[in-house]
């Protein structure tokens, strides 16, 4: 019918996305365990940062601030493979964002801001944090932890007098994370570059195995390119410059194994400092606007539905949708939604007896540190399995600041997360670029 034909091109992206979202292969992908490397050192750094951050308020007689300090210490999750100078800049920036977020949302809660307005503020934060993470390429966990900080700021019934102590605790935690995660520069400043070359070699070997998936070659080329970026950064610093030629020659050999036409470039590594500002400028024209819009829209809807439904922590719903949308494709969003939803429900059941147990402050702190360390060793292998430790850890951290009914806390976490995951997938279906398709054009295959 003529009246309906104009709507068909507009619905084409939705139909294509629906075909992609409903692909049964996503369920198999959600069950698959991925290979991972170099996770132990990063896990130990994160565990040490969280342990120190929790211990300081506990020893100072302010256990109620331990949760905010440990949140600040979660900046240690970022930049784990970056060269030390970039890692320091990234951790300082993320730590500032975390501290400011906790302060701002504590202030909103203390001022008695209506729930729907705070929900809108959390969604706006999620969108802004997503844009930041995409532009400066923070990598996992992306904007999720920053949104978690907003939920922590809103938790409890804070007064204006709580704003400063909470922010100070978060800043101290972030500072400890910065010190722990950059301490290696004093002993072996070239360690990130050596690790990058080793990871590139491992990726190339994986791509050359018989029966390797087609995407393994692309992953190997990405690892080689990443290693070259790290070497270029090292070449611009006097403390690491001397080791660059040998590492570049090693990387050339790795690349030639992947591509016989590779040209040796060991003596011509450019000295390029990898600054956050330069990275953001180089990616400003890239595809960051659509993911940002999806995160903002999904966060607003998920948080509003949770608030209207009377769920106890509406910000967790926004965090759930944000986590689902931190990837680059519909496939990633669906797999992440399945893993996060199922993993959180199971994790909430595991958290219930831990929350009800009389662990005391130091017992709870010890469990949080162990769970955090274990999480970082498995999260890159299987996100759903990691949720079995992430969920109890997050709820125990919450209980450090605000003891609550264990069953209510666990139920809120499960419901809010599942709601957020569902809304995140809906955002993939419904939020698309505004494009005009001529009547003669045929939509391309789903991506």
Residue ranges and their predicted role:
Residues 100-111, 131-134, 153-161, 179-187, ...:
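Alpha-helical membrane-embedding segments
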Residues 236-242, 329-330, 356, 372:
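A cross-kingdom feature marking solvent-exposed beta-strand/loop segments within repeated
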Residues 285-358:
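Core alpha-helical transmembrane segments of integral membrane proteins
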């Amino acid at each position: 019918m003529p009246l309906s034909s104009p709507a068909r091109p507009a619905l084409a992206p939705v139909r294509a996305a629906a075909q992609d979202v409903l692909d049964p292969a996503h369920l198999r992908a959600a069950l698959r365990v991925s290979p991972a490397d170099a996770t132990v050192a990063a896990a130990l750094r994160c565990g040490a940062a969280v342990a120190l951050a929790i211990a300081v308020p506990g020893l100072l007689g302010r256990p109620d601030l331990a949760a905010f300090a440990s949140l600040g210490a979660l900046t240690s999750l970022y930049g784990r493979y970056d060269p030390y100078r970039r890692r320091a800049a990234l951790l300082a920036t993320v730590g500032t964002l975390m501290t400011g977020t906790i302060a701002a949302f504590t202030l909103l809660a203390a001022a008695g801001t209506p729930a729907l307005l705070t929900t809108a503020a959390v969604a706006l934060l999620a969108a802004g944090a997503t844009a930041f993470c995409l532009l400066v390429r923070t990598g996992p966990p992306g904007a999720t932890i920053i949104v978690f900080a907003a939920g922590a700021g809103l938790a409890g019934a804070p007064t204006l007098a709580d704003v400063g102590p909470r922010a100070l605790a978060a800043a101290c935690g972030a500072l400890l994370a910065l010190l722990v995660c950059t301490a290696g520069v004093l002993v072996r400043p070239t360690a990130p570059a050596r690790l990058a070359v080793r990871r590139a070699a491992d990726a190339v070997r994986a791509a050359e195995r018989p029966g390797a998936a087609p995407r393994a070659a692309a992953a190997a080329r990405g690892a080689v390119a990443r290693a070259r970026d790290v070497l270029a950064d090292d070449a611009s610093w006097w403390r690491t410059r001397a080791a660059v030629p040998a590492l570049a020659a090693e990387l050339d050999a790795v690349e030639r194994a992947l591509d016989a036409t590779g040209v040796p470039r060991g003596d011509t590594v450019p000295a390029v400092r990898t600054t956050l500002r330069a990275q953001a400028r180089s990616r400003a024209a890239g595809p960051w606007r659509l993911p940002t819009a999806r995160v903002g829209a999904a966060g607003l809807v998920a948080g509003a539905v949770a608030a209207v439904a009377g769920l106890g922590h509406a910000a967790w719903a926004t965090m759930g949708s944000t986590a689902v949308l931190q990837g680059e494709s519909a496939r990633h969003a669906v797999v992440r939604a399945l893993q996060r939803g199922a993993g959180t429900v199971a994790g909430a059941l595991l958290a219930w007896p831990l929350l009800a147990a009389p662990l005391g402050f130091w017992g709870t702190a010890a469990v949080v540190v162990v769970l955090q360390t274990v999480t970082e060793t498995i999260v890159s292998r299987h996100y759903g399995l990691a949720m079995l430790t992430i969920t109890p850890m997050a709820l125990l951290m919450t209980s450090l600041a605000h003891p609550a009914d264990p069953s209510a806390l666990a139920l809120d976490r499960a419901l809010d997360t599942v709601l957020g995951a569902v809304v995140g997938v809906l955002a993939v279906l419904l939020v698309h670029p505004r494009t005009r398709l001529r009547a003669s054009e045929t939509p391309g295959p789903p991506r």
